[in-house]
Every structure is written in structure tokens, then in C-alpha cells.
Amino acid sequence: MTKFVFVTGGVVSSLGKGIAAASLAALLETRGIRVTILKLDPYINVDPGTMNPFQHGEVFVTDDGAETDLDLGHYERFISTKMTRRNNFTTGQIYESVIRKERRGDYLGGTVQVIPHITDEIKLFIRNGVSDAQVAIVEIGGTVGDIESLPFLEAIRQMSVQLPHHDTCFIHLTLLPYISSAGELKTKPTQHSVKELREIGIQPDVLLCRSDRPLPLDERRKIALFTNVREESVISAIDVDNIYKIPALLHEQMLDEIVCHRLGILAKPANLTTWKKLIHALEHPEHEVSIALVGKYVDLTESYKSLSEALIHAGIHTRCKINIHYIDSENIERHGTGCLANMDAILVPGGFGKRGVEGKIMAISHARNHQIPYLGICLGMQLAVIEFARNCLQLENAHSTEFNPDTPYPVLGLITEWRDRRGQIEKRSPQTDLGGTMRLGGQECLLKPHTLARKIYGTDKIIERHRHRYEVNAEFIPQLEQAGLQVSGLSAAENLCEMIELPQSRHPWFVACQFHPEFTSTPRNGHPLFNDYVRAAISFADKSGHAKLRDHNMQKNVATDSTH
């Protein structure tokens, strides 16, 4: 039977419950325990697919085509278990399911209430999401005290009563603010947060105390005394410069051992060799490159979380320090491409809407004309096609029907029909609802021989995850190819254009894909596309002299530091 670890948060939001849950899962996995993670989101949206990235951050797409919370990306990057649509559910999904049952008459005419019907449905969704895992870590979104979270907290309280004593463990993540005028960490917010949790009926077994400095022993004892938690179970979760250091940080304080003891699990000792190698590679780079990420959501970098992590993973596997420069494409529209002058590579990610599109096209043109390594993802591929059509085919005003329905040269258009991996036909029209209706999840792509894409992947068949409505218009592909643009990947089912590139005789590294390779990158393995992209950036830096300039500046800084 599956055992459960419930992770809650207090004081403020965005403390890092997802990273804490993923780090604990990674530790348990190194001990030979089959583990999975669930994320419960209290918002009423059915999923985050239609939410503004500035409000929610990135939408992470699972292999089975679910649009989920970005925390599921952290889960997949930290453990080997692949997430599915069952690993993330929202208040919207719970109410939708309960109302559907009520309409069918499943409740036999009874009055449908939050307790027991909503809480029972939450418990059912949790049990359905654990699969065959020995331990399921369940992260409750939001903050203790939020009205929206109450049904979820009540549901997990009920589970702790209904399951055997050693089958549940509660971890509460809280904040210890440092007051500089007093010169101390303040424990009162943590005490009140735990008090509120206990009023609901939940007693934490472990406290993770987030702070910017180590937790003094006296303060640890004080917290333990006032929250009814054992002293060794009050864990100091200090800020680190890289999230991949957190498993080792928590292991040093025996979090995995405490949880195993609470759950009555006998497991082999944790083996952090792989994690230590990753950290060593991160901290001892042999190269350094600057990559321009040209987007429209750059004011909230969480919107590109998987992408930035994939670049870091590539840095690990190429022994390269990656400096990501987030550049607003609207600034390029206003001020030109001067901000790209010292970049070693340019990347245009996915996105929706017309705002900032012309700035991205200008960045792509700059990369193509100046032989700078370019990687386009989703919209980044579509705009590369538009840029090529306008400037190499001389198709003035070529565009996507997403941005200009009346364009004389619709080089991209709405996908109206495709076959998913289950073999089912999906159909769409401009009148279709926006939520959950894109081409989503893992799709098979066939790579053409003698292409850079085929060389990078080392195989002729790949599966990558998609999230888009628009595709390259097949009517224009012969013209594009005749002008020198190479279609290097096609979908196996419909022959849709999935990858494009410029021959290396015309450009050293210009590759774009319709899918999202960042969703399958992990720190352990990286991703072949990002790894090769960073190698191309290193080569460009060496040839352009950027690498020598950085080495000179680094040596100058070291010399300056030694004189002080």
C-alpha cells in the first residue's frame, strides 16, 4: 500500500514547496524507494493552459498531453518517474467531476456539499494519482490560511485518520524572516502558521524553515517547543545559488531518514554520487557563453523555467557556464538589435499573441545574417519560417494566420485535423474553445537523413512534447526548400513540419523545432538538442573573441580581488 507525505506551506507563497518535494523525492529514490509526486492546485481553473504566464508562470506539458503546473517540471527533473495528467489536479477539476456525478444522479438525490462530497473527490483523485508508488509526496498549493486551500487540507486530514498511523507524514514549509535592525531570525510567523495548521487538525511531523542564513540552535529549540515538533525534525532550509544543491542540503540534516522512520520504511542508505557530480560540473566550468533569450514574458522568468533549466543542464554536460540574458522583444522593435551584439547564441521560445512578434523576427534575422547559433522553439520555429519567407523568398507581408488572418502569404495556419498517439483523430476550428484544445503531448517525429537534426539526435525517430495550434503551411514548403530552408523533421502521422534548419554550408548552427525539447531535459542526461546548441555557442564564442575577452575580464577581477 502506498504511503503519503503531505507538503504544505505557510506564512507566504512561493517558498519553494515544489523544490522541497522534488528534493525529498530524489533522496528517497536514491534509497531504492519507488516514489511519485502529486500537485494539488486550489484555483478554480480546470488547468493552467489558458492562464497568463505573468500570473502563473510556465505551463508544463506532460507526455500524455496534460497542461500542468510548472512544479511538475521540477518533479521530472529531480526523479526518474514521468508525470501524467493524474499528477496534477485543481479545484476546477474536482468541482467539474462532482457536478458531472450529480447530474448523472450518482448521489441519489442527496444534497451535494463540500464535506463530504468535495473532500471525498479530492481523496479519490489523490489515490488515483499514486499508481504503484511506495511513497507518494503530495504538495498542496497555496498557503495555510487561504480559503481556497481548506477543502484540500481537510481531505488530507481525513486521510491521516483513515490510514494506518505510519502511512502518513506531514511536512510544513515556512519562512523565518531576518530582521536586520534586530539582528535575528523571527520565529513568530512560523509559530502562528503551525498554530493555524493544528487548528485544522494537522500536526506537522517535520518543519522546513526557509531563511537566508543558518538556523541557530537556540531558535531551533524554540521552534520545536512551540510547534510540538521534535528538535531534529526542525530543518534549516537556507537559500542556495542552485536548486540542485538542495537534496544534499536536506540529506545532511537527515530529512530522508526522518521521513523513512516516520513511515516505517527500512531502506538502503542514500547514494548522492550522481548529484555530487552534477554540482561539481556546475561549479567547475571550462567555458562560458552568453545566450539571448528573446521573449515577451521576460519580466517573469518563471515563464521560461524549463527552458532556463534545460540550458543549465546543457552547461553541466558541456562544462560551460551559461549566462542567460532575458531580452524583451518589444525593446528590439523600439531600439533595434544592438542588445544582441555580444551574444554567443540566440534563442526564441514559444509564446502566443501578436505583441512582440516583429522584434523576435528581427532577432532571428540578426542570427541568420551574422552566423550566430540560433535555436527556435515552437513559435520560434514559426517565426523563423516567416523571416525566411520574407527575406529570402521575398514574400513581403508573409505571416501566420494567427497574427494576420488576411496575409497574402499564409506560411503558417491553424491545424484543423491530426491524429494523436492513441490513434484518435482530433479536429479543431477557429471557433473551438481555447482550453485544452491544442496539439498536446508526446508526438512521434521522423528525422531526415543527412541533416543536422539527425546527427544531433543520433536516430531517425524521436518523441517530443507539443503545445501549439498553428503549423507550417505545406503549400509553401517546396518554395522554402528551393530557397535553401531544409525541413529536417516531419510528424509520423500527418507529415506536418516539425523541424527546420539551414544547411551548415549556409549557417554553422540554425535549427528550429515545433515541439518543446525543454520539457524532457534533465540534469542527469541533458537533452541532445540543447547540448549541441551550447557546443555551437562555445565554438562561436571562441571564433568571435568573446571567450578571450571574458577570460581577460575574469583574470582582471581576480587580480583586483587579490589586491584588496
From Swiss-Prot:
ATP binds at residues 14-19, 71. GO terms for biological process: 'de novo' CTP biosynthetic process; pyrimidine nucleobase biosynthetic process. Mg(2+) binds at residues 71, 139. UTP binds at residues 13, 186-191, 222. It is an enzyme of class 6 (ligase). Pathway: Pyrimidine metabolism; CTP biosynthesis via de novo pathway; CTP from UDP: step 2/2. Residues 1-265 are annotated as: Amidoligase domain. It holds the Pfam family GATase. Residues 290-543 form the Glutamine amidotransferase type-1 domain. It catalyses: UTP + L-glutamine + ATP + H2O = CTP + L-glutamate + ADP + phosphate + 2 H(+); L-glutamine + H2O = L-glutamate + NH4(+); UTP + NH4(+) + ATP = CTP + ADP + phosphate + 2 H(+). GO terms for cellular component: cytosol. Keywords: ATP-binding, Glutamine amidotransferase, Ligase, Magnesium, Metal-binding, Nucleotide-binding, Pyrimidine biosynthesis. The active site is at 378 (nucleophile), 516, 518. Allosterically activated by GTP, when glutamine is the substrate; GTP has no effect on the reaction when ammonia is the substrate. The allosteric effector GTP functions by stabilizing the protein conformation that binds the tetrahedral intermediate(s) formed during glutamine hydrolysis. Inhibited by the product CTP, via allosteric rather than competitive inhibition. Its EC number is 6.3.4.2. Gene3D superfamilies: 3.40.50.880, P-loop containing nucleotide triphosphate hydrolases. CTP binds at residues 13, 146-148, 186-191, 222. L-glutamine binds at residues 351, 379-382, 402, 469. GO terms for molecular function: ATP binding; CTP synthase activity; glutaminase activity; identical protein binding; metal ion binding. Belongs to the CTP synthase family. CTPSs have evolved a hybrid strategy for distinguishing between UTP and CTP. The overlapping regions of the product feedback inhibitory and substrate sites recognize a common feature in both compounds, the triphosphate moiety. To differentiate isosteric substrate and product pyrimidine rings, an additional pocket far from the expected kinase/ligase catalytic site, specifically recognizes the cytosine and ribose portions of the product inhibitor. Catalyzes the ATP-dependent amination of UTP to CTP with either L-glutamine or ammonia as the source of nitrogen. Regulates intracellular CTP levels through interactions with the four ribonucleotide triphosphates. Homotetramer. This is CTP synthase. It comes from Nitrosomonas eutropha (strain DSM 101675 / C91 / Nm57). The gene is pyrG.
